[in-house]
């Protein structure tokens, strides 16, 4: 009997309320702090660009920073392969602990780096190397947090759990980064921010490492993984000890490919909305840091509402219909919002557009987490979910770089964004049309 035939896990391993709560909190905070660490770079991108990748053309400097962000994303599949393998073979909990602590330490290390004015061209090289290291740990966080939370969740609430962790966690991470950005902008106003403010923002990444101790001391292993190990020991099932290799076998390659159409669109939607808003507000709208941070905090709250709503909606109408609905809305409404926001001069109008963009952007990937978990059985779930998510989001994470490169000046950014969004969400809709409905298929 293969692990794909494993049934009755919920009844064989009753979910204790306290452990379910701990698992959900750990998954939510793990992903929140992971995104918090990544958002720090997005919020200080213009400053970091000038310090590590100086250029007389602002959009080129900005593109270089986003390229360094894409470097991290490219290493995330590697991290998913490493930590996903460990999570599938040895357990989710320890994989999650090591990955989250690693992200926190590597993020804080950015605050110690010398700038190009202090160390010459070794500075951007060190910056990129550290981004590579961080990417491996981030990939590990995805493979573990995106699995253990859904395996503890109640069957009829897995979609809401998906939105809460995947999108809500990202919203919390962005909210935390916005708050830290506001505090640091106040403590280090004007030119002082380019000296110490950005460094202190990176030091705040150590919050992730503190969460590691919560996980180590309060979280039990996933009931699905424990049941799998129990049945393996009894000889009633077999499970592969090479989950990554199995994912690329003929039986799973098509599943992985279709998943990528969804995760690529969801990742692009996220990085071209919540991820690009900080730079858009500064470079296109010219909003001051203190005002921008407040707008971004509001956008983060709206992003959480959107993610939980659309994740929960998928529990009622299914994952496939939710993807189709959101894809159409994104392709039509996001360009309208960005073009309108570029013309807005009133702070209230800019804020409303930013809130609408954040709402739409997080709707696009709210159900993705549970969709991916339902696509794979327990024996390869961490590896399959992690690789599907990280490869798609790695591709999506390159889009801000391409948007910046396609824009000769800040005035061209809104139209470039609109074109990229329409094209990519057509691809997303094709994927949504081709995938099967997965609601309730959890094994």
List each model region and its residues.
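Glycine-rich segments within core transmembrane alpha-helices of 12-TM secondary carriers
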Residues: 159-185, 208, 388-400
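Extracytoplasmic gate region of multi-pass secondary transporters
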Residues: 42, 252-303, 396-400
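Multi-pass alpha-helical transporter architecture, strongest
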Residues: 212-219, 371, 422-443
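Helix-to-loop junctions at the C-terminal end of transmembrane segments
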Residues: 79-91, 307-319
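C-terminal ends and interior cores of transmembrane alpha-helices
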Residues: 101-120, 329-344
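Cytoplasmic membrane-interface "Motif A"-like loop-to-helix N-cap segments
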Residues: 89-101, 316-328
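Extracellular/periplasmic helix-loop-helix junction of adjacent transmembrane segments
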Residues: 45-77
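Hydrophobic core of transmembrane alpha-helices in multi-pass small-molecule transporters
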Residues: 120-139, 348-363
């Amino acid at each position: 009997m293969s692990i794909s035939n494993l049934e009755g896990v919920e009844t064989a391993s009753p979910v204790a309320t306290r452990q379910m709560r701990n698992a959900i909190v750990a998954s939510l905070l793990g992903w929140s702090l992971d995104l918090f660490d990544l958002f720090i770079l997005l919020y200080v991108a213009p400053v970091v660009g000038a310090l590590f990748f100086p250029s007389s053309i602002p959009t080129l400097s900005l593109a270089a920073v986003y390229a360094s962000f894409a470097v991290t994303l490219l290493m995330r599949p590697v991290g998913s392969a490493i930590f996903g393998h460990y999570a599938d073979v040895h357990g989710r909990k320890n994989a999650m602990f090591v990955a989250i602590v690693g992200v926190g330490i590597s993020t804080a290390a950015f605050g110690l780096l010398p700038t190009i004015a202090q160390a010459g061209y070794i500075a951007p090289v060190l910056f990129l190397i550290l981004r590579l290291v961080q990417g491996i740990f981030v990939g590990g966080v995805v493979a573990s947090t995106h699995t253990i939370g859904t395996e503890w969740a109640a069957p009829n609430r897995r979609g809401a759990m998906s939105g809460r962790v995947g999108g809500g966690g990202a919203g919390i991470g962005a909210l935390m980064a916005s708050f830290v950005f506001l505090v640091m902008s106040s403590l280090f106003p004007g030119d002082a921010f380019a000296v110490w403010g950005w460094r202190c923002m990176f030091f705040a990444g150590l919050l992730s490492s503190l969460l590691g101790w919560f996980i180590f001391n309060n979280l039990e292993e996933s009931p699905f993984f424990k049941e799998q190990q129990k049945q393996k020991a009894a000889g009633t099932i077999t499970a592969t000890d090479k989950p990554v290799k199995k994912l690329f076998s003929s039986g799973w390659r098509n599943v992985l490919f279709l998943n990528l159409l969804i995760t690529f669109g969801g990742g692009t939607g996220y990085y071209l909305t919540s991820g690009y808003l900080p730079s858009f507000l500064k470079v296109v709208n010219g909003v001051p840091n203190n005002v921008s941070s407040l707008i971004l905090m509001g956008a983060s709250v709206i992003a959480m509402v959107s993610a939980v709503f659309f994740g929960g909606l998928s529990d009622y109408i299914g994952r496939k219909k939710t993807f189709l609905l959101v894809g159409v809305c994104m392709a039509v409404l996001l360009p309208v919002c960005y073009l309108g926001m570029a013309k807005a001069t009133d702070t209230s109008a800019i804020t409303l557009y930013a809130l609408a963009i954040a709402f739409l952007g997080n709707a696009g990937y709210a159900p993705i987490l549970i969709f991916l978990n339902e696509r794979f059985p327990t024996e390869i779930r961490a590896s399959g979910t992690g690789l599907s998510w990280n490869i798609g989001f790695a591709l999506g994470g390159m889009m801000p770089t391409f948007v910046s490169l396609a824009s000769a000046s800040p005035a061209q950014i809104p139209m470039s964004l609109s074109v990229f969004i329409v094209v990519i969400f057509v691809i997303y809709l094709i994927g949504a049309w081709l995938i099967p409905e997965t609601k309730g298929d959890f094994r």
